[in-house]
Amino acid sequence: MVKLTSIAAGVAAIAATASATTTLAQSDERVNLVELGVYVSDIRAHLAQYYMFQAAHPTETYPVEVAEAVFNYGDFTTMLTGIAPDQVTRMITGVPWYSSRLKPAISSALSKVGIYTIAN
């Protein structure tokens, strides 16, 4: 599985337009791409858990781009552009392990690329 650090490095190029300590809105596309990178990495690392969650919550849908990114082990960051910020938030916060696993990983990944967020 792809490590979080490699995902963070992959999206660093997109976030490169941000300075070392840039503060951005949570809905900024650069923030969303880092979040989605962590999310895709987490799905890859815990695929069975996501399948079980999907089976238990069939109305929780994901954009096709996320599924393609999960199974495409190349550079997927360009696939994830254009996903609406509210949809990113819904997907990421909608899983039971958001607080315990995703939120800390997202905070770490954002920090590594020098992005800090403010509420919209």
Curated annotation (Swiss-Prot):
Endpoints of the signal sequence: 1-20
GO MF annotation terms: structural constituent of cell wall
Claim: Signal is one of the keywords in the record: yes
GO cellular component terms attached to this protein's record: fungal-type cell wall; fungal-type vacuole
Biological processes per GO annotation: fungal-type cell wall organization
Superkingdom, taxonomy of origin: Eukaryota
Entry keyword set: Signal
Family of this protein: Belongs to the SRP1/TIP1 family. Seripauperin subfamily.
Protein name: Seripauperin-10
Taxonomic source organism: Saccharomyces cerevisiae (strain ATCC 204508 / S288c)
Gene designation per UniProt: PAU10
